[in-house]
Amino acid sequence: MRTRPAPGTLTVGPVALPDSPVLPAAIAGVAGILFVVLRLLVVARGDPSRFVVAGTTFTDPATAPHGLHIFPNNGYDGQFFYRLGLAPVRMAHTAFGIRLDTTYRLQRIGYPALAWLFTGGQHRMLPDVLIILNVVGLAVLAWLGAVLAQDCGRHALWGLVFAGYFGAVLSLSRDLAEIVAALMTAGAWMVVAIYHVAVL
């Protein structure tokens, strides 16, 4: 691990902000929670399955899991991550009443596989876990970004740049995989940059 400059503080007016990865992680985590709670109460009407944004074009209301809200339209990509989260090893084009729009979806298995792991295969928990994974992922992404920023001699708050990209709002609101994908990329980058792991 490289030697970096001694930690310091960033002063904003009369407030001194510590140079710690915990600060951007906490800011990103709280922002993610507030956004999800507001969306859940205002837009989703208290129903976390609305974050999936399943639509009748690809999701059959007659055979889809009980309790999944299905919109009368195409839906959005979250319905495919939800479907893969129900059974990641089930590679059929149609399962649980949800038809994949393309087999390309099967390659994006990380986020739904993690969700399946944390639900223990309990389908009713999946909408909640998909949301929780993205909120936690946002906080961890900010933490990893802060560690990388510190390694480059910057204040830890620069970690918010990693968590603050515009797509995070869409990922949080529609159960998309970008936050988890960015988290895995930043984690790999940290291992390579800080610990000098050789890359082929």
Show where each model-derived region lies.
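Start-transfer (signal-anchor) and selected internal transmembrane alpha helices
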Residues: 1-63
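Short acidic/glycine- and proline-prone juxtamembrane loop motifs at membrane-interface regions
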Residues: 173-180
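Short linear capping/connector segments at secondary-structure termini
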Residues: 95-101, 128-132, 163-166
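Alpha-helical transmembrane segments of multi-pass integral membrane proteins
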Residues: 103, 130-134, 177, 189
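Transmembrane-helix signature of polytopic, membrane-embedded enzymes
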Residues: 125-129, 145-165, 182, 195-198
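Transmembrane-helix motifs of polytopic, lipid-linked glycan transferases
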Residues: 113-120, 129-152
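Short hydrophobic/aromatic helix or loop-helix immediately within or flanking a transmembrane segment
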Residues: 75-123
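Structural signal for the C-terminal ends of transmembrane alpha-helices
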Residues: 188-196
